[in-house]
Amino acid sequence: LPLKEYVMPNCTFHIVDAFTAVPFTGNPCAVVTDADGIDPSDMLRIARETNAPETAFVLASDKADVRVRYFMPRGEIPFAGHPTIATGHLLRELGVLKPGTARFEFAIGVLPVDIRPDRVIMTQPPAVPDTCADAGTTAQALGLQASDLREGLPCQLMRGGVSFLMVPVRELAALRRINMDRPALKAVLAPLGVSAAYVFAPEGVAPETDVHARLIDPDNAGEDPFTGSAAGCMASY
């Protein structure tokens, strides 16, 4: 194929591991700190090149302290949790944001982000309960039995800035047994208009935790190591 001249602005990006204190663990995010002037089509190209679960692009805002756009390799998304934590942490480390409450402009609106010396806390829009999925079909698509699900709690869509299907299971062992049937899970999720199921148990791996969860996504890598926006939907559920 003939080569054609292609020029785009230079940019700086950092790889930030969110939800961890140990490098190369947690959930990685690429953060481009000087994204003003980058065309959205180039943002998508950069996201595909970094191949991180999400790539954040920091821009100037006339409504907030910063504006942020998030891209997965497949396209732009309106909001996400771990990129917000990663971006807030990096901007604090670079001295762009000082400790206190910062205002981030997202595609879904302006939200507060609490910048602290030792952590970053995001606020997301409340999620509201919506359509329920058939419990037996959902369990089967995840490689589980209907008896693995928590009795009396529905497999339910929680609709918010980003929406997910909530799937409550009885115990941690059920989470470990998940063996997704991709086509079957896609068939469960497609009518709900979401791409992932958030499966959670009422016990944690560590003694100081109360819940353990897995984000099962048949369209991408299969599983996201930590999904902040889904955790917020679970809290609303």
Which residue ranges define each predicted feature?
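Active-site proximal loop and beta-alpha junction motif in alpha/beta enzyme cores
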Residues: 3-79, 85-237
